[in-house]
């Protein structure tokens, strides 16, 4: 787990095109990593405490983790079909 230091969007590698949501996270062990925020819409901002899991995003260079939706400060995906 860690604290968001920056929440922003990046563009994927060719030939894909999107504005993928990612955040920079300072972990409790001192590492600073980039993590992908999955799902439609999110409530993360600077200083949000999030839980991350492994799993890279193939078309975003340097993104090797996913934020866990519905844990700590990260809300689950709103209006997601059950």
UniProtKB/Swiss-Prot annotation:
<comment type="function">
    <text>Interacts with and stabilizes bases of the 16S rRNA that are involved in tRNA selection in the A site and with the mRNA backbone. Located at the interface of the 30S and 50S subunits, it traverses the body of the 30S subunit contacting proteins on the other side and probably holding the rRNA structure together. The combined cluster of proteins S8, S12 and S17 appears to hold together the shoulder and platform of the 30S subunit.</text>
</comment>
<dbReference type="InterPro" id="IPR006032">
    <property type="entry name" value="Ribosomal_uS12"/>
</dbReference>
<feature type="modified residue" description="3-methylthioaspartic acid">
    <location>
        <position position="59"/>
    </location>
</feature>
<protein>
    <recommendedName>
        <fullName>Small ribosomal subunit protein uS12</fullName>
    </recommendedName>
</protein>
<keyword id="KW-0694">RNA-binding</keyword>
<dbReference type="Pfam" id="PF00164">
    <property type="entry name" value="Ribosom_S12_S23"/>
</dbReference>
<comment type="subunit">
    <text>Part of the 30S ribosomal subunit. Contacts proteins S8 and S17. May interact with IF1 in the 30S initiation complex.</text>
</comment>
<comment type="function">
    <text>With S4 and S5 plays an important role in translational accuracy.</text>
</comment>
<dbReference type="InterPro" id="IPR012340">
    <property type="entry name" value="NA-bd_OB-fold"/>
</dbReference>
<dbReference type="GO" id="GO:0003735">
    <property type="term" value="F:structural constituent of ribosome"/>
</dbReference>
<comment type="similarity">
    <text>Belongs to the universal ribosomal protein uS12 family.</text>
</comment>
<dbReference type="GO" id="GO:0000049">
    <property type="term" value="F:tRNA binding"/>
</dbReference>
<keyword id="KW-0820">tRNA-binding</keyword>
<dbReference type="GO" id="GO:0019843">
    <property type="term" value="F:rRNA binding"/>
</dbReference>
<keyword id="KW-0687">Ribonucleoprotein</keyword>
<keyword id="KW-0488">Methylation</keyword>
<keyword id="KW-0699">rRNA-binding</keyword>
<dbReference type="GO" id="GO:0015935">
    <property type="term" value="C:small ribosomal subunit"/>
</dbReference>
<dbReference type="GO" id="GO:0006412">
    <property type="term" value="P:translation"/>
</dbReference>
<keyword id="KW-0689">Ribosomal protein</keyword>
<dbReference type="InterPro" id="IPR005679">
    <property type="entry name" value="Ribosomal_uS12_bac"/>
</dbReference>
